[in-house]
Amino acid sequence: MKKGEIYEGVIEKIDFQNKGRVKIKDTTVTVKNGIPGQKVRFMINKKRGGRVEGRLLEVLEKSELEKRDPLCSIFPSCGGCMYQTMLYEEQLKMKEEQIKKLFDDAVDYEYTFEPIKGSPIEFAYRNKMEFSFGDEYKDGPLSLGLHKKGSTYDVLNAEDCKLVHEDMDKILSCVLHYFRERGVSYYHKMQHTGY
């Protein structure tokens, strides 16, 4: 395997921090932003110290765990809620396995693992979010929302974010309109300009 080569494989499992594991011959490749069971195309972008990482290029086949359509208009470009197409119970099960593995790897004694307790509400539950101003794309219009998955600078408008109450969507829309109307620029990290 060499950097830049493209492969296809099935994500066998997802470890904490959304790190998918794809087996290619005798090599396990870490591919972020997938769901167990998805057949994906990825490009090798890091190879060092016996570890290989790939960048997801395309989902070729859905996973059996993907049993519903996404509710969000900017899914899957946004990295805010990766598992929207999975049933909530399946998300909890997968996350519980990830947490249990973290504990198993960290402690060398027996312990009692309490299962995850799911929220009674699946969407519009967040009372805190960190939205950013930025360009929708390079030199594009001002946007206010969440960073595009895998991007430090591109920001997707979160006009109908399903993680927050609809009142927050209205506030975001008003704030964005206010700054666009006045031509106020966001703070550009590289140029040290804007507000």
Residue ranges and their predicted role:
Residues 1-195:
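Accessory RNA-recognition modules of RNA-modification enzymes
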